[in-house]
């Protein structure tokens, strides 16, 4: 082995050990000496990006992550295991994404809070996204949102492969949805149920068994096809464009709101689709959850590029109340660590 290469490897290994022990200043000092190295330079830029993100400079992290990919476009071949879905990713340049100019909840300006190289995420990655995600924080709403996002038509061109595993029925969730539907029945006697975002159809299947009149809406043809396979009526539609005079007793909105551009309009739409004595159940990741606080920078949801929003308990409950709902129940998700499940009823009950 060339002595120069061996020296570079020794330096990088030493720097990485310091990084792992959270001695970021000492690690950075060594990494800066490796930036011109023909092999380790790219990895030095990458780890410096990690350090910048962890120490509170997400915009510097963004520049460093991209510099690493520019120096070595196939960087991940030495960062990920061969069985990782993005092991063979090769950076070909930044794609245009639509800037999110302000907080989608209140319209005020946010500040960069995190930056992550998203190719490390193992599930639901869409390669139409840029490989680096900056998250913005709104202190007024205590809400986090994506700095930029691809156009919808670009997203749709990559969804079938990316979401394939999502549209498989997970029978282990049947018991939980039975519990949820029984709880919802305590807030309404009605039996008409609408689910928006069908996923693996676990909820609607259980609802049918329990005697509910079920209808589904999904933007993904895979979800609609699965519902129809099970004999469940469903429509392929962006629910924001879903027009009907029908009202429902129960609406299930599981893990959808983090994907929408305008959460406020979505909640208003749900309010309009519910009967006056109707009840809403929704779930979404919570960046303030006990799980997320403990995991910090290892929180996988920070890598989830298909999400436009990352709610907190405060931002979600405030939004519901501002749109005419009264939150009546809050639970931790038993299936998605760090996610919350909320039940809300229409505020008209308090005005009778």
Label the model's feature ranges:
Residues 9, 16-19, 43, 74-254, ...:
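Conserved N-terminal segment of class I S-adenosyl-L-methionine
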Residues 98, 253, 260-352:
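S-adenosyl-L-methionine-dependent methyltransferase catalytic module, highlighting the catalytic core
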């Amino acid at each position: 082995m060339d002595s120069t290469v061996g020296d570079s490897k020794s330096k990088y290994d030493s720097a990485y050990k310091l990084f792992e022990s959270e001695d970021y200043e000492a690690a950075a000092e060594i990494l800066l000496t490796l930036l011109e190295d023909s092999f380790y330079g790219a990895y030095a830029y990458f780890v410096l990006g990690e350090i910048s993100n962890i120490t509170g400079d997400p915009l510097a992290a963004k520049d460093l992550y991209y510099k690493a990919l520019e120096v070595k476009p196939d960087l991940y071949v030495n960062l990920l295991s061969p069985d990782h879905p993005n092991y063979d990713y090769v950076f070909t340049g930044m794609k245009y994404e639509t800037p999110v100019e302000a907080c989608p909840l209140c319209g005020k300006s946010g500040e960069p809070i995190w930056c992550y190289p998203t190719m490390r995420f193992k599930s639901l990655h869409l390669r139409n996204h840029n490989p680096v995600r900056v998250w913005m924080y709104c202190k007024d709403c205590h809400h986090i949102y994506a700095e930029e996002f691809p156009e919808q038509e670009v997203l749709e061109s990559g969804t079938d492969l990316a979401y394939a595993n999502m549209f498989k029925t997970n029978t282990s969730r049947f018991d939980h949805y039975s519990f949820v539907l029984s709880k919802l029945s305590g807030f309404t006697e009605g039996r008409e149920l609408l689910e928006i975002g069908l996923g693996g159809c676990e909820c609607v299947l259980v609802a049918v068994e329990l005697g509910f009149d079920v209808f589904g809406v999904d933007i993904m043809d895979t979800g609609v096809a699965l519902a129809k396979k099970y004999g469940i009526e469903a429509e392929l539609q962006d629910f924001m464009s879903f027009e009907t005079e029908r009202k429902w007793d129960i609406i299930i909105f599981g893990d959808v709101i983090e994907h929408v551009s305008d959460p406020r309009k979505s909640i208003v739409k749900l309010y309009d689709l519910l009967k006056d004595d109707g009840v809403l159940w929704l779930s979404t990741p919570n960046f303030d959850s006990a799980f997320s606080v403990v995991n910090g920078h290892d929180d996988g949801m920070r890598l989830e590029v298909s999400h436009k929003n990352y709610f907190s308990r405060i931002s979600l409950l405030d939004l519901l109340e501002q749109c005419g709902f009264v939150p009546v129940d809050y639970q931790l998700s038993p299936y998605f660590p760090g996610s919350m499940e909320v039940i809300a009823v229409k505020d008209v009950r308090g005005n009778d």
